[in-house]
Every structure is written in C-alpha cells, then in structure tokens.
Amino acid sequence: MRVAYTKARLASRIRQLARSISKDYAGRTLDVVIVLDNGYLFGADLIRSLSVPVICHFVRAEMRDLKLAGHERREIYFSWPPKLRGRDVLLVDAILNTGVTQDFLMKQLEESRPRSIRLAVLFDKPGARKLDIKAEYTGFSSASNYWVGYGLGGRDGLYRNLPYVALSPPSRRKGAATRRRGAARGRVKSWKG
C-alpha cells in the first residue's frame, strides 16, 4: 500500500479544522453527530481538539442497493440522536463522496429544528458528487481514490486500524469480490440502534 496521508499530516489538518470550528462556535455548546463506521477516528480526534463544550452522538448510516421487481432502490438505515431542537449541530463524516448519505442525514437532522447545522468531512471527493452538497469544514479535497486506514475500512473492514491513510490495494476495495463472485447481491441488513 502507498501512504497518501501520514499520521502527522492528518493530525495537523484536524487541529486546523478544530480551531476554525471552535472559533465559529465560541461561547456555545456543540452537538457533534459522528457517522459510523468510517468517521469514528476522525470524529474522535476532532472533538478532542475542539475548545468548545461538546455533546457527542453517533449515527450509523448504511446505504444498500436493493433490486425489487426489476427496479433498483437505495435505502439508508440509521439510528438517530435525541433532542437537537434549538441546538448547534455538526455532522462529522470521513468522506463526502456522492453526497447521498450526508444529504439524507442533514435533511433528517433539519427535521429536529436545530439552531444551526453544518458538515465537517476529512476528505471531499467533488468529482464523485451526485447531489449539490458542500461541507463547511473540509480536511482534504482529492480525486476519487479508494483509501484505507485511519478508520476507513476496505472490504471486510480491513485496515481501519492504520494510523495513516493509504491507497487501497485493488483486491481489497469494497465490492471487488462481490463483482467477481456476486456474493452479496440481494442481502440487506437493517441496523437498529
């Protein structure tokens, strides 16, 4: 694997993001909603670097392609944090790729009528975007590479424990085995929290 972002580079950029977020929310308590699984390390390091009071929540959003009666449908399964009405909310995710998941979660969060809601991502891949959504706080903007490490897992969740971000070996990219074997087609698991 080739290292794309070192541990030191990630830490430096996260501290910069935390300073900017802390300045924007000075004097206020911030409800941080971290998207699992990919966002957990970025979220943990980010909230530890913030200088404002933080209430931390977690949401797991899983997007699945379903083939029903010849039609393909996407569903997102998620659990939800409580009582965000009138609060300042920061949604934290590792990667803003197509924007489908983040757009869905932002709309769901807006239904709880927070005072403000913003998005922070470690990586932005604008070339992959399917929806018009932008993060207010972005660590790095990059091409649509497939990465592992620092919370980002390859197929079967491998390499999440790496302290850096690397380009994934082609054989470990999500979906590589599925395309070859067709193993995971038609299986959908709903996560309830």
Segments and roles (model prediction):
Residues 1-193:
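PRPP-associated nucleotide enzymes
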